[in-house]
Amino acid sequence: MPRDIIILECTEAKAEGKPTSRYVTTRNKKSLRTPGRLEKIKYNPFLKRRTLHREMR
């Protein structure tokens, strides 16, 4: 199955006006489990805590 390369960007740092952290990952193109944007809790080194990262388009 083909996979897409996606970028996850921190949502909390953007709201606070600090540098955003970004992660690169892959996802299945035709996944029925995650039809919308992917969201994961990842570590943000600028905020020094785990934050919500959302898929960019």
Curated annotation (Swiss-Prot):
Gene3D superfamilies: Ribosomal protein L33
Pfam families xrefs: Ribosomal_L33
Signal peptide start and end residues: none
SUPFAM superfamilies the record matches: Zn-binding ribosomal proteins
UniProt GO BP: translation
Cellular-component GO terms for this entry: cytoplasm; ribonucleoprotein complex; ribosome
Gene Ontology terms for molecular function: structural constituent of ribosome
Keyword field: Ribonucleoprotein, Ribosomal protein
The keyword Ribosomal protein appears for this protein: yes
Family: Belongs to the bacterial ribosomal protein bL33 family.
Protein name: Large ribosomal subunit protein bL33
Organism annotation: Akkermansia muciniphila (strain ATCC BAA-835 / DSM 22959 / JCM 33894 / BCRC 81048 / CCUG 64013 / CIP 107961 / Muc)
Classification of source organism: Bacteria, Pseudomonadati, Verrucomicrobiota, Verrucomicrobiia, Verrucomicrobiales
